[in-house]
C-alpha cells in the first residue's frame, strides 16, 4: 500500500490540517485502521489526533481517494468531530480487543 498526499490545507478556525490523498493498493480496499497508521507514519503525526473521514474506491482501479484531518489538540477534535467518525477511527480499543482474544 502506497499513499500519496494530493493536497494539504490548514484550517485556522478548526485548528487542524486537512489532507486529500490517494492510496494505491493490491487486493481489497485498505481498512481505515491500516490507512490511519500508514498516514500517521508518513506525516510523523500522533495517530490519536488524526481522523480519516473517508476512503472511496475508484472504479476499475487498485486505487482509492481519501480525506483526513490532523488536529492540533484533542479538545478541538472532540468538540468538532461527529461521534460515528470518532468510533470509526478508534485504534486503541480495537487493538486491545484483538489482543484479548
Curated annotation (Swiss-Prot):
Keywords: Ribonucleoprotein, Ribosomal protein
Keyword ATP-binding found: no
Superkingdom to which the source organism belongs: Archaea
Molecular function GO terms recorded: structural constituent of ribosome
One GO BP: translation
Keyword Transport on entry: no
One of the record's GO cellular component terms: ribosome
InterPro entries to which the protein is assigned, alphabetical: Nucleotide-bd_a/b_plait_sf, Ribosomal_eS24, Ribosomal_eS24_CS, Ribosomal_uL23/eL15/eS24_sf
Family in the record: Belongs to the eukaryotic ribosomal protein eS24 family.
Protein name according to UniProt: Small ribosomal subunit protein eS24
Provenance organism: Methanocaldococcus jannaschii (strain ATCC 43067 / DSM 2661 / JAL-1 / JCM 10045 / NBRC 100440)
Gene: rps24e
Amino acid at each position: 500500500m502506497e499513499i500519496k498526499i494530493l493536497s494539504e490545507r490548514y484550517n485556522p478556525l478548526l485548528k487542524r490540517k486537512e489532507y486529500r490523498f490517494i492510496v494505491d493498493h493490491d487486493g481489497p480496499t485498505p481498512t481505515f485502521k491500516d490507512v490511519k497508521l500508514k498516514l500517521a507514519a508518513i506525516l510523523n503525526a500522533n495517530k490519536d489526533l488524526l481522523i480519516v473521514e473517508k476512503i472511496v474506491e475508484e472504479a476499475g482501479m487498485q486505487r482509492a481517494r481519501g480525506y483526513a484531518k490532523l488536529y492540533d489538540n484533542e479538545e478541538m477534535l472532540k468538540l468538532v468531530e461527529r461521534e460515528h467518525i470518532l468510533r470509526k477511527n478508534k485504534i486503541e480499543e480495537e487493538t486491545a480487543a484483538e489482543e484479548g482474544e
